Amino acid sequence: MRHRLLIVDDEEHIRVAMRTFFSHRGYLVDSASEREEAEALLVNFAYSCVIADLRLSAGHGADGLEILGFVKERCPDTRIILLTAYSSPAVETEARRRGVDLFIHKPKPLAEVGRLVESLIRQGAES
């Protein structure tokens, strides 16, 4: 079975790079640039993992946390990774409280992100 990923980031070059990277590794990959678009995809497709930026646009610092809540409510088996270049201990604590599976600080090499995604999906399949 091919795993399906959802990449949510407001920066197009990041979405394209991640989509290309994971597609070449055999994943089915969808992407969204904003929370509403991501939620529409989540209603229509089953994802093994969602990789979302914490801050999707200026002034919407909680978008990643809102996506996290939406996924955990509607798709509890889907793994969630939040990416951020901007964080604080309080935000990370709140993300963990809401059920994030992994918090990754940018920048992180794609190869390392790929290993983390693969490991997280494998853990989910074993539980």
For each predicted feature, which ranges?
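Acidic, metal-coordinating helix/loop segments flanking the phosphotransfer/catalytic sites
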Residues: S31-C49, S57, E73
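C-terminal output helix
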Residues: A90, K108-E118
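Two-component/phosphorelay signaling modules centered on CheY-like receiver
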Residues: E12-D30
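The C-terminal output helix
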Residues: R115-S127
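Short amphipathic alpha-helix used as the core "switch/output" element in two-component signaling
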Residues: A40, A62-D77
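Two-component signal transduction core modules
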Residues: V50, I80, F103-I104
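Alpha4 helix (beta4-alpha4-beta5 surface) of REC/receiver domains from two-component response regulators
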Residues: A62-E66, Y86-I104
